[in-house]
Amino acid sequence: MRFYNTLTRDVDEFKEMNSGRINMFVCGPTVQDHFHIGHARTYIFFDAVAKLLRNLGYSVFYLQNITDIDDKIINKAREMNIQPQDVADMYLREFLEDMSALKVTSVNYFAKSTLYINEIISQISRLIEKGYAYETSDGVYFEVSKFADYGQLSNQSLDQIIHGYRVAVNENKRNPEDFVLWKKRKPGEPYWDSPWGPGRPGWHIEDTAITETYFGPEYDIHGGGSDLIFPHHEAEIAQMRAISGRKYLSHYWIHTGMINVNNEKMSKSLKNFVTIREVLKEYRPEDLRYALLNANYRTQLDFSKGLLEESRKQVEYLNSTFRKLVNASGNSDLSADPSAVIKRMVDEATNDFDFRSVFRDLIDFAGDLNKNIESISRPAAQKAIDVFRWVDSFAGILLPETARLSGIIDDLLDLRKNLRTERKFQEADRIRDLLLKNGIHVEDRGDETIWW
């Protein structure tokens, strides 16, 4: 498997740190507003990646943080005249509902930042001890100039960063590029006790505290949107490597491209901000997954109604073909070798996650099938179904009603097979008769059972 690594700016062969196991962290959202299609692109993509890796035999621990304390959350709470924690809780529920609706089901654990205050304080204390951080009257800051590799991920020199910095002057900081680790308490804001007085964590330190808790100082894959490369991911690297003294925080960095809407940058000011929920009022989750995965994940994507309409057509075509396969009961074999099709798709999916080529091959395969799909034999149809299921296992493009029927039948036949093995023939026959009553024929051919 090979994919583009932002850290090396090249397509690298992947080698996990521990054989067969992958630790993957993806930056989660700040829960302070409705979630948009930019979020959808990132989280659908990494959902597909995690599921693909598991299909390939890896044990993947997929960790995602939830930023539940932040300036934006505090400002939103003031606008709504409620507590910041109420804002965070409300939008976290919405986020999890959106992810469930989009079939994003691969995350092992969502870690809320406020549950890791002790770990955050520990990291800041170690950075101060090692001379990388300093306290001021308004907080604790990381001194960027002390970390020689700052800018490596974003391909900038420290001089470029310093000269290009455009921030409001803060006389408490030694240098304008230094970033905050701990913000001392302001009236009316949430706070936690710390060695530097009551306050709250900075954004960057939250993620490294969480990843160190679960993965230690070094792990396999870090992902997120390309807008996070600088300064957020750059800061994460500086923090953890300054503490650990190691060469890596994450060995591989994967970033998704930004989204334009009708050829314009998506933003609230342009009033072209498209939320996940708005899209799902008109389109199915499978349509959106297809649209967002059917493009190079690193490129900028132009999002439009036309894109969704085309994706809906393709999803319907593939699902229609799948339903025909479920009902196939002829005598013909397949013109294409399903195992060869899957092998080609595996090669494409593991070559920088080229899901677009996988979809193209599935469309071509469906085209071949539809030339004589009514005459395809049951065993041949089952092999073709395996191709669709393999793609769906990470892409999530089969409609629930389409996938459910085939899955339920196979589960029942597995149960029947076990009953026959245990010589419980009466119970096995009841399953066969139940299926027949619902128009599904079951036939045993030696060690193989087919249905139509």
Curated annotation (Swiss-Prot):
Identify the residue span(s) of motif 'KMSKS' region: 265-269
GO MF annotation: an example: metal ion binding
Question: What Gene3D superfamilies does the record tag this protein with?
Answer: Cysteine-tRNA ligase, C-terminal anti-codon recognition domain, HUPs
Sites binding ATP sit at K268
Task: Give the enzyme's EC designation.
Answer: 6.1.1.16
Q: Name the needed cofactors.
A: Zn(2+)
Reactions mediated catalytically: tRNA(Cys) + L-cysteine + ATP = L-cysteinyl-tRNA(Cys) + AMP + diphosphate
* Compartments (UniProt record): Cytoplasm
Motif range for 'HIGH' region?
Answer: 29-39
Q: Entry's PANTHER family?
A: CYSTEINE--TRNA LIGASE, CYTOPLASMIC (PTHR10890:SF3), CYSTEINYL-TRNA SYNTHETASE (PTHR10890)
Q: What is this protein called?
A: Cysteine--tRNA ligase
The organism named in the record is: Thermoplasma acidophilum (strain ATCC 25905 / DSM 1728 / JCM 9062 / NBRC 15155 / AMRC-C165)
